[in-house]
């Protein structure tokens, strides 16, 4: 226990005291704007407030001047509560006011964590570390390692229900008491105000408002959880943690751990539960995968250890059903938009020794990835490219655009989806997706020109659309040649993993969260 706390305190000691006065300087918000915070609420249209999609530095400066006035924040909030049923202008004003503060707070607290990430990459001297940021960089690792594992635990990572738990974790990292009080005030007032407008059951911890702040708190929770879970690997001289280090949701990574011992930190003394000689841990967004060569009983020990770990350290209960243990040979798991599985192929080989001949049954394992067609069709239907049964339809909202813009939009979506799903071993779903988008584009153009899709394609020729839908940019990729069958014919298939997929467009992201 003392050893664990020592490692934790040593890691936290690198953090410097945050400067609370920075929050009241308008250049901090300009700094945030210049660095392209695309997830910020200020880049979304504020029609209700009468502002454009770029937040105004002059407006921020005026609000900061008002914040300097004594008790202005408290008076403004009380005034909003008193005039709740008079109109909604006060709500939007308070909403915008709280977003300004939360955005500035998130920018300031991210600075030292970002510096720690840069220094961590420089210390480890990881060659081409930017390639590890691609979500496709996980799949070559899976293809190499899962063939040797027996069981897999599909873990849905829980998150604290109460925000005070996240604030307490942040308190152990920073020394600025004023910033912590401000954060508690923002969370408390935001929760109370939102509960007056909508039912509490509709409140989600990662709401669209204050998204940057909530993502930072969630990243801090994930960092704390994974540091305490896998910290023994840092003691090894030849095995190093390969990850982003901090702000984990922004970089997709994998972790290799061997000879890992897990410590039950809620005990008075160090208690080693087990030592797994071969275990792998992978996480993306709110899900993680724990693979092991051990037995089913060993994986159950991992499961109950994680449940107790969340209960005693983070003080909230996690349901055991959130951790699903499956035998890898009989299980396909959904991960990053793919259904992945380990297939066992059997082949008969005839051996002959002198005058005797006999048949040998040879078993080979293969990592297989396929595209789930149902979530794909559901996402295309939600975006109004086809019906729920997969029948292509026109996109009426795009008929006001120029023909070249319509073709470019459809082609861009098709290329990006094809780009991301290029790692599939079976291309039928990919070809069906291209067919739906191509015919939807033709129907949209035909609707604009008041013609039929068939006559439009005959007049325009299908070669023009095919040229747009097959154009591909030059990017870094990995090619893995696939199976050679021992028959009269040879079938060659390749799986391509691109190392440039850092951010995923909305349609692909919709596929990733669909279950």
Curated annotation (Swiss-Prot):
UniProt-recorded name of the protein: Maturase K
PANTHER family per UniProt: MATURASE K
Species the sequence originates in: Curcuma longa (Turmeric)
Key word DNA-binding present: no
Function: Usually encoded in the trnK tRNA gene intron. Probably assists in splicing its own and other chloroplast group II introns.
Domain of life the protein comes from: Eukaryota
Family: Belongs to the intron maturase 2 family. MatK subfamily.
Annotated localization: Plastid, Chloroplast
Main localisation: plastid
MF (Gene Ontology): RNA binding
GO terms (BP aspect): mRNA processing; RNA splicing; tRNA processing
Swiss-Prot/TrEMBL keywords: Chloroplast, mRNA processing, Plastid, RNA-binding, tRNA processing
Cellular component terms per the entry's GO annotation: chloroplast
UniProt xrefs under Pfam families: Intron_maturas2, MatK_N
């Amino acid at each position: 226990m003392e050893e664990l706390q020592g490692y934790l305190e040593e890691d936290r000691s690198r953090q410097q005291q945050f400067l609370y006065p920075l929050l009241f300087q308008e250049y901090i918000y300009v700094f945030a704007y210049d660095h392209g915070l695309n997830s910020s609420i200020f880049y979304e249209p504020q029609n209700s407030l009468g502002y454009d999609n770029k937040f105004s530095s002059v407006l921020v400066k005026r609000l900061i001047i008002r914040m300097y006035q004594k008790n202005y924040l408290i008076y403004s909030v009380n005034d909003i509560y008193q005039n709740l049923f008079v109109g909604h202008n006060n709500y939007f004003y308070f909403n915008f006011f709280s977003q300004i503060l939360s955005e500035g707070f998130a920018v300031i607290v991210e600075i030292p964590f970002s510096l720690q990430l840069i220094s961590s990459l420089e210390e480890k001297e990881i060659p081409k570390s930017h390639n590890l940021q691609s979500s496709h960089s996980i799949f070559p690792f899976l293809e190499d390692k899962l063939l040797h594992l027996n069981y897999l635990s599909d873990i849905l990572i829980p998150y604290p229900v109460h925000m005070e738990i996240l604030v307490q974790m942040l308190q152990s990292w920073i020394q600025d008491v004023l910033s912590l009080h401000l954060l508690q005030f923002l969370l408390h007032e935001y929760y109370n105000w939102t509960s007056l407008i909508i039912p509490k059951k509709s409140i989600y911890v990662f709401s669209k408002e204050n998204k940057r702040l909530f993502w930072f708190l969630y990243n801090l929770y994930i960092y704390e959880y994974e540091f305490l879970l896998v910290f023994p690997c840092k003691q090894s001289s030849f095995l190093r943690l390969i990850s982003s280090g901090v702000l984990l949701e922004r970089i997709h990574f994998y972790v290799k751990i061997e000879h890992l011992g897990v410590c039950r930190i809620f005990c008075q003394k160090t208690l080693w539960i087990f030592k797994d000689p071969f275990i792998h841990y992978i996480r993306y967004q709110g899900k993680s995968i724990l693979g092991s060569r051990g037995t089913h009983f060993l994986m159950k020990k991992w499961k109950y250890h994680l449940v107790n770990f969340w209960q005693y350290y983070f003080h909230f209960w996690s349901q055991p059903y959130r951790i699903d243990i499956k035998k890898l040979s009989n299980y396909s798991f959904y991960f990053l938009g793919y259904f992945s599985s380990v297939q066992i192929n059997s082949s008969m080989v005839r051996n002959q020794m002198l005058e005797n001949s006999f048949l040998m049954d040879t078993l080979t394992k293969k990592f297989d990835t396929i595209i789930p067609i149902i979530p794909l069709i559901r996402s295309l239907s939600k975006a109004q490219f086809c019906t729920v049964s997969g029948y292509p339809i026109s996109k009426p909202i795009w008929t006001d655009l120029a023909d070249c813009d319509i073709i470019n939009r459809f082609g861009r979506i098709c290329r990006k989806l094809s780009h991301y799903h290029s790692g599939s071993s079976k291309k039928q779903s990919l070809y069906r997706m291209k067919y739906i988008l191509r015919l939807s584009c033709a129907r949209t153009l035909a609707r604009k020109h008041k013609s039929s899709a068939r006559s439009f394609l005959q007049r325009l020729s299908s070669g023009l659309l095919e040229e747009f839908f097959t154009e591909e940019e030059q990017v870094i990729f990995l090619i893995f040649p696939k199976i050679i069958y021992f028959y009269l014919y040879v079938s060659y298939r390749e799986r391509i993993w691109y190392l440039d997929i850092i951010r995923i467009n909305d349609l692909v992201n919709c596929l990733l969260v669909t279950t």
